[in-house]
Structure formats: structure tokens, C-alpha cells
């Protein structure tokens, strides 16, 4: 037995050594982990060449590891940067779409106004000559106010157009009755007969309706594109919470610490983390989709009855038709005005001949066919612009609910859907077993990867939700032909708008809206009430002053 003792002992030791060697990891080298770490710009001295004890790790699994404490800290910062970068890329693409479309629309509308003004000027110079030149500021003011409305919104379109026709009637009435002298009081009386006599035919009423609806829709649509651009821009800047940052580190780089540099996070694992980290962004979904639907409705109006291009292109001909109507009916109009306002005073004989030679209205309408209408720099029609934007709007719908999935679909963030068995689940190379939670803050209570405080919504997100809600309301008003009150893009408040209603276009009953003009009182009633209030204030002030004087005397 003794002679077999030494060989048996040696065999036993050999078996034990083999077992111990088999129990150790196949590779203790951290060379690949170190190489990738250095490739990100970090100091190679932070990375060990071989596995070390991982008791120092705070987030990543402890045990033997290729990560030092410095590596874990830097990976934590890197994971947040990676997350911000991918989210920003997703949002920046959408933001760029809205920014470029807003720019195109803005340029198109502004140049459309410039071209319409140029066309009217060219036509009226050829048609009316010196007579137009002497009164051209009237038309410059018209286009100036239209531009001001589009840019700032601080114009009541209906009042502005009514004022234009009143001023034009004043000029026309003087011209067709140049042998008379008219005082300002007399011309004020003339204006009272405007509605009754309709000196310009039906053009003012139709043009007021068309211009108001078209400009409201155009400006609201452009403002909507700007709001969408700004909302996406503000929300694209994400700041991960401490809990989100831990989950990101665990997902993106803790696998490196175990030497699994080529193993990507499981798709569903990534989805849960993104839903937790982007919980507040998910709450934008409802109002965002409502906003997109409202934009699409206004786009349909721009393609149809509210097409600003079809309104502005022939505006010169329409105004000229109105002028010709006034000229052709000038005798009847003048007689009725003289009956209602009394006979005007004739000018002295010398002044009559001079007045007739200087300003008599004798121009007749001649069809004007310009060789070529000016084209906009956008190089396309409104219809094509709207069609393009409609397509982009449809693609943008459900953007926020799709954002977590889109982020995880990026190859830098997770493995593909088809690689569910050989992926990183936060602990090792395995299959991810947890179900994916829903979108939005309220659904994160049971998120297995990220602790989310569902009681504290993000203030910035709440503000963007409110901005979308307000803009959606304005879109519905514009869709129904009603002007809306705006805060300009530059956050300067705009003036009140005017309500035009849907006289010629039936408005869907299901769209609730708040017109700016209250029901129950006519415009005249409202004007009378406002005037009474203004007149009442000076009398109250006077009474107050008298009371102060009496009290002052008593004090003395």
C-alpha cells in the first residue's frame, strides 16, 4: 500500500489542479474592454489589463470585473451623453422639418403679398394713370395693413377692410362730383349710405369674407408650424434623473465590465428604460396628436375655400371691378346721396374748371393682361407646399409614443428585436423576461428598470402641453373661419382679431370654437355699448374731481 501512496497523492493533486483551473474564467484579459475605453478618449491608466475584484463598483454587478471605480464614473457620464445624443437626433430631425416648412410658408406668404401689391400697382398705373398715382397711398396702406396682420396679428381685418372701402368711397365720390365742395361732415354722411347704396357692388362684402378667412388660415397655419418647431426644440433637451442615469449606465456599459463588449442590450430591456427616462415626454402624446389633427384640418382649408393664393392673385381685378361699378353707377349713387345728405355746395366757376381738369375721373376699365405674373422664391404653389406639409404632419403623429422604440431601434442603444436570447439584460447575457410598460408618467409605477416619481410631472413638459392645447383651439377657430387672438412668435401680444363666420362654407357642428365676436349683440350694438362706456368715464372723472375740490375746501 505504501508503494502506491506517492503516485496516488500526485494523481490526486493533478486532478485538483485541473478542477481549479477549470473553475477559473477562460480569459482574465481586459484588453478589448481597455481598447474600447481608450477609443472613447478616456485615460488608459483607468482601465486594468486583467480582471480585478469589483467590490468598489456602485451600479454595475460586483465580482471580478474589468472596470475600475474611475471607469464606472466615466461610463456613467458617457451613458448620459449617449442617451441625450440619440434622443436629440430623433427630435432634431422632426424639429428641422417643421423649421424648414415654416420658413418656406413664411417666405411664400410674404412674397405673395409683395407680388399682389406689385401686380395691382402695375395694373392701376396702366389703367388709371395719374389718377391712381395721386391716390396710391390708399392702396399702399391696404397692403401694409395686410402685411402687418400676417407678421404681428395686431390688425382687425374686418375693420381695416371697411376703413379701406370707406376711404376709397370718399376719394371716388369727390372725383365723380368734382364740381362740388364736400366738407368732412358731408363725407361722413355719405359713408352712412354705403351699405344701403352698395356703390362698389358686392365686391367689398365678398372680398372681406375671402380675405379674412384666407389670412386667418394662412397665419394660423404658419404659427402652428412655428409652435411645433419650438415644442420639439424645447423637449429635445433631456436631463436624466439620478434613477434614469443609473439605469442607462447599467444598460449601456455594465456589460463591458464583464468583458461582454460585443453583447448589446435586449430591445425590451432598452424599451423599459426609455419609457422610464422619457416618461414625461410620453405625456405630450395626447395633445400632440390633437394638434396634428387640427393642423391637417386647416391644411384642407388652405387647399380649398381659404386658399390665400386664389384670393390675393386676382385682388387687383376685384378692386378695379369695384371702382368701375362705382363709376358706372355714380349718377344714381350721387342723386340718392344728395337726397339724403342734402345738396352740396358748388365750387366757384374758376375752381370748377381747374378741378375738372386736375382730377375728373374719366378712366375706363381696360382688361389688363400682364406678360407674366411674378413667382415666389419658393418656386411652387400653395397647393404643393400644403401637400408636402400634410405628408410630414401625418408622419409626425404619434411621435412621442414612438420615441422610446425609435431610440432603442438605434443600433448604438440596443440589439434588434430578432436577437432576444443573446443580449444583455442588465445582469448578464440572457433573455429579457420582463414585460414592457406603457408610455407616459402614469404607467411607470411598475417599471422594473427605472424608479419614476409619478407624482411630479415635468414643468417644461406641462408648458408645452399647454402651448399645444392653446394652438389647437386657435386652429379650430381658423378652420371655422373665425379670427383668433395671438401671441406672436416673438412673444409679443397681438391685437384682437375679427370674426368672419362661415357664411359660404358650412362649418362642422362637432367642432366647438370660441368666436371672438360675442353672440347676442350686433356689431352696432357692441359699438354703441363701447361708446357709451367711453362717454361715461369722463363724466365720472369730472364728478370725482368736483368731489375732491369740495373736500379740499372743507379741509381748509
Q: How would you name each of these model-derived features?
A:
Residues 21-361, 374-382, 397, 404:
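Extended alpha-helical scaffold/tether regions of large eukaryotic proteins
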Amino acid at each position: 500500500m505504501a508503494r502506491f501512496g506517492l503516485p496516488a497523492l500526485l494523481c490526486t493533486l493533478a486532478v485538483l489542479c485541473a478542477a481549479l483551473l477549470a473553475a477559473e474564467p477562460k480569459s482574465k484579459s481586459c484588453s478589448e474592454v481597455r481598447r474600447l475605453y481608450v477609443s472613447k478618449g478616456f485615460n488608459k491608466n483607468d482601465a486594468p489589463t486583467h480582471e480585478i475584484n469589483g467590490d468598489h463598483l456602485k451600479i454595475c454587478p460586483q465580482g471580478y470585473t474589468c472596470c475600475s471605480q474611475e471607469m464606472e464614473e466615466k461610463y456613467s457620464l458617457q451613458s448620459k451623453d449617449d442617451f441625450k445624443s440619440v434622443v436629440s437626433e430623433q427630435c432634431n430631425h422632426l424639429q428641422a422639418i417643421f423649421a424648414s416648412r415654416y420658413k418656406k410658408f413664411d417666405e411664400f406668404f410674404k412674397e405673395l403679398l409683395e407680388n399682389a401689391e406689385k401686380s395691382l400697382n402695375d395694373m392701376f398705373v396702366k389703367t388709371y394713370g395719374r389718377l391712381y398715382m395721386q391716390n396710391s397711398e390708399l392702396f399702399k396702406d391696404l397692403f401694409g395693413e395686410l402685411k402687418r396682420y400676417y407678421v404681428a396679428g395686431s390688425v382687425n381685418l374686418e375693420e381695416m377692410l371697411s376703413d379701406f372701402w370707406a376711404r376709397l368711397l370718399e376719394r371716388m365720390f369727390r372725383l365723380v362730383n368734382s364740381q362740388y365742395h364736400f366738407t368732412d361732415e358731408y363725407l361722413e354722411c355719405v359713408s352712412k349710405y354705403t351699405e344701403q347704396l352698395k356703390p362698389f357692388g358686392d365686391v367689398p362684402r365678398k372680398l372681406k369674407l375671402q380675405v379674412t378667412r384666407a389670412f386667418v388660415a394662412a397665419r394660423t397655419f404658419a404659427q402652428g408650424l412655428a409652435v411645433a418647431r419650438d415644442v420639439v426644440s424645447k423637449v429635445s433637451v433631456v436631463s436624466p434623473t439620478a434613477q434614469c442615469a443609473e439605469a442607462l449606465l447599467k444598460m449601456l456599459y455594465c456589460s463591458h465590465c464583464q468583458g461582454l463588449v460585443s453583447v448589446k442590450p435586449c430591445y425590451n430591456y432598452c424599451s423599459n428604460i426609455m419609457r422610464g427616462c422619457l416618461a414625461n415626454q410620453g405625456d405630450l402624446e395626447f395633445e400632440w396628436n390633437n394638434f396634428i389633427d387640427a393642423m391637417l384640418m386647416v391644411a384642407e382649408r388652405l387647399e380649398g375655400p381659404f386658399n390665400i393664393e386664389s384670393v390675393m392673385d386676382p385682388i387687383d381685378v376685384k378692386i378695379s371691378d369695384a371702382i368701375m361699378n362705382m363709376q358706372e353707377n355714380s349718377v344714381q349713387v350721387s342723386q340718392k346721396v344728395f337726397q339724403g345728405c342734402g345738396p352740396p355746395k358748388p365750387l366757384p366757376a374758376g375752381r370748377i374748371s381747374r378741378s375738372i381738369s386736375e382730377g375728373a375721373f374719366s378712366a375706363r376699365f381696360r382688361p389688363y393682361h400682364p406678360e407674366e405674373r411674378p413667382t415666389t422664391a419658393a418656386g411652387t404653389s400653395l397647393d404643393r407646399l400644403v401637400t408636402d406639409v400634410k405628408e410630414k404632419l401625418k408622419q409626425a403623429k404619434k411621435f412621442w409614443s414612438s420615441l422610446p422604440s425609435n431610440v432603442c431601434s438605434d443600433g448604438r442603444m440596443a440589439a434588434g428585436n430578432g436577437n432576444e436570447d443573446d443580449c444583455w439584460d442588465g445582469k448578464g447575457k440572457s433573455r429579457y423576461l420582463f414585460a414592457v410598460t406603457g408610455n407616459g408618467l402614469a404607467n411607470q409605477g411598475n417599471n422594473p428598470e427605472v424608479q419614476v416619481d409619478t407624482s411630479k410631472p415635468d414643468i417644461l413638459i406641462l408648458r408645452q402641453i399647454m402651448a399645444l392645447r392653446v394652438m389647437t383651439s386657435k386652429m379650430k377657430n381658423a378652420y371655422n373661419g373665425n379670427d383668433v387672438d395671438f401671441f406672436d412668435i416673438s412673444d409679443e401680444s397681438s391685437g384682437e382679431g375679427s370674426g368672419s363666420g362661415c357664411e359660404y362654407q358650412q362649418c362642422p357642428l362637432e367642432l366647438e370654437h370660441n368666436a371672438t365676436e360675442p353672440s347676442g349683440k350686433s356689431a352696432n350694438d357692441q359699438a354703441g355699448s363701447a361708446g357709451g362706456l367711453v362717454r361715461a368715464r369722463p363724466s365720472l372723472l369730472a364728478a370725482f374731481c368736483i368731489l375732491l375740490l369740495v373736500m379740499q375746501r372743507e379741509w381748509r
